């Protein structure tokens, strides 16, 4: 197998065709494991070997069951499905057998809930690799991340005798909704890493640009609040009911009234409110889906605590039961200077790169930061960077596609990083 653009495009289009949402990436994980096994130099870890179930966020059993059934129907390797034990994602360990550093590289693998455009001008339609899973699409470029990760693995297999130390390639499930990284971090699988690197393709940068030091990663918590009241006839006996919808409505106004923190940026958004059973019934159930963000972990924790206090207070005020669930999370992270300089240096060595930006305000959240911070807290160094690529539409849009030539650029940046740290 040759490590060239043709091979990378082939992989990318294969994974683009079969997108799977978070915690249901059974076919994707199985296929990744197939390719890794063929390289014959990696130990492959799956399931509870890399996932701590106590820290799994936003995993719905119905989605898991459907994903597993679809993977089996599409021919996923039963050997890997059994080893997953219901949890997706994998880690590939290369051990050179020689003393040296350990590097962890993270690539996310899930898709988004978007129906891919049927426009004949859309390249995946022209070339026959559009999504076959209706309602799901790799509209954020994670199929490219999988491809780059496999490209790095192939390069390692071809250069294994020249390397020292260890490389751990993390194929992470459920990045969308920032749901997957915490469970991997809490498994301890990367606690021994001296270096951690991850990236995103395109996003805010076009072909020819690398953002070596995006800053202002926001800590975030995704929270669901559910209220349970009591139904009653809205005309004849409203006094017998306990109104969950009214409780939820008051919650929304109070949440948006949380005092902003004086030491940094805060954000809150209630994105979904669902309630009620009928126009003549006192609503007995309500659910809110919301997120808070903070400039750092402490500020985000302040926002989260305020949300929990409001939910509790409203439940008492309206005499309704309540429950809260954290369904996603990410933290802030500062890139380490040593790795920023390395990514700058490596990027400028690539003929396709003509611009390296080392000061970009990200002002969003990414759960790779949980893994990066985990490595930093254990004495290692971490970086998250942006690999520019021209795109046909914004991320999470039905028309999204990107410049496939940048797949090879991505592989070259990562392999150069490995080479400089482990040769």
From Swiss-Prot:
Q: Which domain of life is it from?
A: Bacteria
The answer to whether UniProt assigns keyword Hydrolase to this entry is yes
- Any one annotated GO CC term: cytoplasm
Extract the InterPro entries matched here: AbgA, Amidohydrolase, Bact_exopeptidase_dim_dom, Peptidase_M20, Peptidase_M20/M20A_hydrolases, Peptidase_M20_dimer
| Co-factor requirement | Mn(2+)
Q: Does the keyword Hydrolase apply?
A: yes
Q: Which UniProt keywords apply?
A: Hydrolase
One Gene Ontology term of the biological-process aspect is: folic acid catabolic process
GO molecular function annotations of the record: dipeptidase activity; para-aminobenzoyl-glutamate hydrolase activity
EC number(s): the record gives 3.5.1.-
Q: Which family does it belong to?
A: Belongs to the peptidase M20 family.
Task: Write out the function statement from the record.
Answer: Catalyzes the cleavage of p-aminobenzoyl-glutamate (PABA-GLU) to form p-aminobenzoate (PABA) and glutamate.
Instruction: Write down the PANTHER family for this protein, in alphabetical order.
Output: PEPTIDASE M20 (PTHR30575), PEPTIDASE M20 DIMERISATION DOMAIN-CONTAINING PROTEIN (PTHR30575:SF3)
Under NCBIfam families, the record lists: amidohydrolases (TIGR01891)
Further comment: Unlike E.coli, AbgB is not present in H.influenza and therefore the multicomponent hydrolase AbgAB does not exist in this form.
State the name under which the record lists this protein.
Answer: p-aminobenzoyl-glutamate hydrolase subunit A homolog
Organism, scientific name: Haemophilus influenzae (strain ATCC 51907 / DSM 11121 / KW20 / Rd)
């Amino acid at each position: 197998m040759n490590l060239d653009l043709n091979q990378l495009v082939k992989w990318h289009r294969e994974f683009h065709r079969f997108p799977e949402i978070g915690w249901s990436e059974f076919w994707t994980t199985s296929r990744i494991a197939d390719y890794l096994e063929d390289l014959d130099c990696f130990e492959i870890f799956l399931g509870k070997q890399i996932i701590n179930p106590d820290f799994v966020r936003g995993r719905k059993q119905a989605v898991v069951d459907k994903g597993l059934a679809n993977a089996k129907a599409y021919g996923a390797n039963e050997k890997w499905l059994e080893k997953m034990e219901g949890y997706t994602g994998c880690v590939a360990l290369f051990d050179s057998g020689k003393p040296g550093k350990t590097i962890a590289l993270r690539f996310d693998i899930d898709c988004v809930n978007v129906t891919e455009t049927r426009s004949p001008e859309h390249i995946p339609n022209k070339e026959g690799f559009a999504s076959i899973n209706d309602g799901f699409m790799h509209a954020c470029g994670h199929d490219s991340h999988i491809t780059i990760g496999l490209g790095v693995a192939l390069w390692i297999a071809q250069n294994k005798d020249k390397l020292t130390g260890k490389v751990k390639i993390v194929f992470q499930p459920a990045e969308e909704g920032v749901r997957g990284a915490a469970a991997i971090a809490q498994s301890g699988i990367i606690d021994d890493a001296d270096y951690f690197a991850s990236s995103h393709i395109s996003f805010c940068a076009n072909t020819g640009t690398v953002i070596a030091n995006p800053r202002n990663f926001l800590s975030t918590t995704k929270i669901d609040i559910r209220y349970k009241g009591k139904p009653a006839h809205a005309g004849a006996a409203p006094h017998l009911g306990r109104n969950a919808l009214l409780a939820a409505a008051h919650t929304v106004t109070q949440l948006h009234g949380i005092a902003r923190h004086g030491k940094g940026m805060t954000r809150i958004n209630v994105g979904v409110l669902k309630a009620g059973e009928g126009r003549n019934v006192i609503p007995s159930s309500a659910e809110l889906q919301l997120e808070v963000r903070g400039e750092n972990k402490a500020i985000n924790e302040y926002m989260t605590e305020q949300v929990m206090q409001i939910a509790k207070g409203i439940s008492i005020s309206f005499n309704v039961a309540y429950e809260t669930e954290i369904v996603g999370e990410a933290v802030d992270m500062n890139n380490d200077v040593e790795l920023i300089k390395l990514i700058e240096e490596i990027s400028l060595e690539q003929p396709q790169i003509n611009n390296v930006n080392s000061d970009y305000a990200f002002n969003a959240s990414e759960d790779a930061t949980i893994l990066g911070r985990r490595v930093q807290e254990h004495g290692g160094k971490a970086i998250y960077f942006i690999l520019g690529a021209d795109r046909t539409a914004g991320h999470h849009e039905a028309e999204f596609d990107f410049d496939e030539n940048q797949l090879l650029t991505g592989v070259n940046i990562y392999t150069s990083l490995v080479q400089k740290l482990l040769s």
